[in-house]
Amino acid sequence: MIEYIIGVIGLLLASVQDFRSREIEDYIWIVLAVFGILFAIYSAITLSNYSILINSISGFVICFILGYMMFLSGIGGGDGKILIGLGALVPKFQMPIYTSLGTLLNLNYIPNFPIMVFINGIFFMVFLPFVILFRNILNGARPKTGKEVILMFFGEKMKVKVAKEQKRLIMGQNDKINFFPASDDEDFSKYGDEEEIWVTPQIPLIIPITLSYLVTPIIGDRILDLLIPF
């Protein structure tokens, strides 16, 4: 249980950092991974059960591979690193299983818990527009048109110089709004650095992952069972 609590603390801290600055400090996933392996060594010795240590190491390795694949897919380096940390920290945790995929993931030395946390987290992304809305409100964005009301849920308003640094795509300004910008919509030359424009949001995946981490011990793979029964 202590590993799970450490995971909660790490994810909450990562969520705050991601929400405020869209950056997650590396020390979080490193602490999760190091604590996970050290605690697994301690538990394996005191309980004379070395499968605990094997699970932690295999969880680290498998989640490292998955996290690297996430990075190559452009999903987010910070989110993938958190997965690596959780793989070492809580590779296994009690949760209900309803699907054949859940049964497969429940095999020995497969980190079924962090994988299921990330799967459920993807489904919880349906709530992300409300996270974006809340962040826009905190940043002082106030819609002046009907289009900007919609953008409060699906875009972010920021200064041009910040948008350029973060390589965002331009969605527009005032009534000149493009809800589906293409990759070439990054010509900031027509705006001043201090102007505020609407740009594409950076998806804070770690927030739905944190929510998933809290509820997955209760629901297991029930969402998969309801939406994609197999």
From Swiss-Prot:
EC number(s) recorded for this UniProt protein = 3.4.23.52
Transmembrane spans = 2-18, 24-46, 50-72, 79-89, 111-139, 205-216
| Claim: Hydrolase is one of the keywords in the record | yes
GO CC, one annotated term: plasma membrane
Q: Could you tell me the superkingdom of the organism this chain comes from?
A: Archaea
| Major subcellular site | membrane
As for subcellular location, the record says: Cell membrane
State the reactions this protein catalyses.
Answer: Cleaves the signal peptide of 3 to 12 amino acids from the N-terminal of preflagellin, usually at Arg-Gly-|- or Lys-Gly-|-, to release flagellin
Extracellular-facing ranges: 19-23, 73-78, 140-204
* Positions in the Cytoplasmic compartment: 1, 47-49, 90-110, 217-230
GO terms for biological process, alphabetical: proteolysis
Please give the Gene Ontology molecular function terms for this protein: aspartic-type endopeptidase activity
Please give the InterPro entries that the UniProt record associates with this protein: Arch_preflagellin_pept, Preflagellin_Peptidase, Preflagellin_peptidase_C, Prepilin_IV_endopep_pep
Q: Membrane topology for this entry? A: Multi-pass membrane protein
Is Cell cycle given among the entry's keywords?
no
Instruction: Pinpoint the site Essential for catalysis.
Output: D18, D79
Provide this UniProt record's keywords sorted from A to Z.
Answer: Archaeal flagellum biogenesis, Cell membrane, Hydrolase, Membrane, Protease, Transmembrane, Transmembrane helix
Q: Which family does it belong to?
A: Belongs to the peptidase A24 family. Archaeal preflagellin peptidase subfamily.
Which function does this protein serve? Cleaves the N-terminal leader peptide from preflagellins.
Note the PANTHER family from the entry: PREFLAGELLIN PEPTIDASE
Name this polypeptide is given: Preflagellin peptidase
This protein's species is Methanococcus maripaludis (strain DSM 14266 / JCM 13030 / NBRC 101832 / S2 / LL)
